[in-house]
């Protein structure tokens, strides 16, 4: 598709943005579908199928929790309330059952997607308050929240996790500082802004010191930190680090 449209109809530099919007519109058209084997192959359906029905079919035939979650997120993000009313109970039933399982990771993610499903049904029927409390109780006692965050691929759900940690734990600045060692760098700016807002300057300086000291162990995080410090994106009076040490560590890392 890209080869056929560029540059006659779409500029090369604008392709990604244009195709993202076009792909969503095509998915919502009941007369067209995307091949599961070839990502950008579009076919005409013999019988119209709504996008909601297609997502439910993919959801139902998948054995993977993570894939089911991806289909559910796509459902929430792209399906209007009226179209989704007849389909959403299947999603809700599955994730409600997952809330009863032994996997804390699945429980946290199931709560988050069920919370988003509230746009289709009466929130009280989902018993979200009770589900949230179950998640909060787990987060209050967990020592592996950095590992949990690594298992969450959705940026919005990572953000939800950060917010729940902040609301649930007195030591949240320390807990969130551990999440800053996660790669790739995605939720980090949001976490850092929250730490700055709460004046957790010693936590931030401690994080920077650990990154410089452990640059070999955290090369991607070191590059992110160094770029922000050297470009003065982070330009605060309370920052306490050695610029010389930062530069020397960077040179050593590049020469290894």
Q: Where are the regions a protein language model picked out?
A:
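Short helix-coil junctions and helix-kink-helix linkers
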Residues: 4-14
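Amphipathic alpha-helical assembly segments used for oligomerization, scaffolding, or translocation
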Residues: 53-63, 208, 212-217
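Leucine-rich, amphipathic alpha-helical/linker segments
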Residues: 55-84
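Flexible helix-coil transition and linker loops at the boundaries of alpha-helical arrays
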Residues: 101-102
